[in-house]
C-alpha cells in the first residue's frame, strides 16, 4: 500500500461559518447642513467610513451631492414639486456644510403641466453671477385664454413665440447677472423671475404656469471658506484678547 496523505482526514469540517463583521461598525454619522437661505437647516444624516491610514473621511465627504425636496427645506408643501441639489464643500466637526448646486422639477409635475390646446414655450440662458458662478437657467411657460375668449385653442403664432422667448431670455439674464448665488436662490424660492416674465409678456400673449424649471451649475469659482461660513451664518474671525499694558517696576534686590 502506498504511503501518502489520506484525503478524507485532511479535509476540514463542512459548515463552519465565517466570522461576519458589521460594515456599519466602521462608519461614522455626519449631519448635513443646508445654507441659511433655507428655513430648515438640518437636511439629514450621511454615513462615511472612518479615517484610517491615508484614507481621510473628510475627503470622502467633500463633493457629495444631496437631492432634497424644497418642501422639506422651506417647511411648505406648496414647493413639493421642486428638488434642490446641495453640494458638500466643507466639514466642521460632525457637520457637512453645503452650498446650492442646482434645482429641478419632479417628472410628474412637468407631465401635468403639458396639456392640449395650448402652446409650450421654452428658453434657456447661460449666465454668470456676481460671485463668478456660471449657471444655465431653463424656463418654461404655457399660453392661456384671453379674457372673454370663445375660441377653445390658445395657440400663439411663431412670431409671438419668438418675442416671448426673447423676453424670457432678457429677464433671466438680467435677474441672475445682477446678484450672487445666494441672492439668486432667494429669488428662485418664491418664483420671482417667473412672475416677472408673466408680467412682461402680457402684451404679446397671456401666459400661465411660468417657471424656472431647472438650474444647472456649470462652473464654480475657487473655493472660499469665508464666503461659505457667511452663507451658513458663521464667522471666520476669532475674538482675540487685547494686550494689557502694565507699568514696569524695577525689582530691588535686598541682598547680593
UniProtKB/Swiss-Prot annotation:
PROSITE patterns: RIBOSOMAL_S3AE (PS01191). One of its GO terms (molecular function) is structural constituent of ribosome. Residues 1-20 are annotated as: Disordered. InterPro entries: Ribosomal_eS1, Ribosomal_eS1_CS, Ribosomal_eS1_euk. This is Small ribosomal subunit protein eS1. It is found in: Cytoplasm. Residues 1-18 have a biased composition (Basic residues). Transmembrane segments: none annotated. Keywords: Acetylation, Cytoplasm, Ribonucleoprotein, Ribosomal protein. Belongs to the eukaryotic ribosomal protein eS1 family. The modification N-acetylalanine is found at residue 2. One of its GO terms (biological process) is translation. Component of the small ribosomal subunit. Mature ribosomes consist of a small (40S) and a large (60S) subunit. The 40S subunit contains about 33 different proteins and 1 molecule of RNA (18S). The 60S subunit contains about 49 different proteins and 3 molecules of RNA (25S, 5.8S and 5S). Its main location: cytoplasm. GO terms for cellular component: cytosolic small ribosomal subunit.
Amino acid at each position: 500500500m502506498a504511503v501518502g496523505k489520506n484525503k478524507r482526514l485532511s479535509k476540514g469540517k463542512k459548515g463552519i461559518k465565517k466570522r461576519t463583521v458589521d460594515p456599519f461598525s466602521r462608519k461614522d454619522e455626519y449631519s448635513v447642513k443646508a445654507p441659511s437661505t433655507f428655513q430648515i437647516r438640518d437636511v439629514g444624516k450621511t454615513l462615511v467610513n472612518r479615517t484610517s491610514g491615508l484614507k481621510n473621511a473628510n475627503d470622502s465627504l467633500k463633493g457629495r451631492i444631496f437631492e432634497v425636496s424644497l418642501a422639506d427645506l422651506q417647511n411648505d408643501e406648496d414647493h413639493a414639486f421642486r428638488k434642490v441639489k446641495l453640494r458638500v464643500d466643507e466639514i466642521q466637526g460632525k457637520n457637512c456644510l453645503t452650498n446650492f448646486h442646482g434645482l429641478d422639477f419632479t417628472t410628474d409635475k412637468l407631465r401635468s403641466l403639458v396639456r392640449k390646446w395650448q402652446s409650450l414655450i421654452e428658453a434657456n440662458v447661460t449666465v454668470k453671477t456676481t460671485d463668478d458662478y456660471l449657471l444655465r437657467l431653463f424656463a418654461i411657460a404655457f399660453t392661456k385664454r384671453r379674457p372673454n375668449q370663445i375660441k377653445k385653442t390658445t395657440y400663439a403664432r411663431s412670431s409671438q413665440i419668438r418675442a416671448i422667448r426673447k423676453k424670457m431670455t432678457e429677464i433671466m439674464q438680467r435677474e441672475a447677472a445682477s446678484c450672487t448665488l445666494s441672492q439668486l436662490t432667494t429669488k428662485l424660492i418664491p418664483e420671482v423671475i417667473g412672475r416677472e416674465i408673466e408680467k412682461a409678456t402680457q402684451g404679446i400673449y397671456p401666459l400661465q404656469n411660468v417657471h424656472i424649471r431647472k438650474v444647472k451649475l456649470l462652473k464654480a469659482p475657487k473655493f472660499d471658506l469665508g464666503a461659505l461660513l457667511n452663507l451658513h451664518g458663521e464667522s471666520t474671525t476669532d475674538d482675540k484678547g487685547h494686550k494689557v499694558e502694565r507699568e514696569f517696576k524695577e525689582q530691588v534686590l535686598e541682598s547680593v
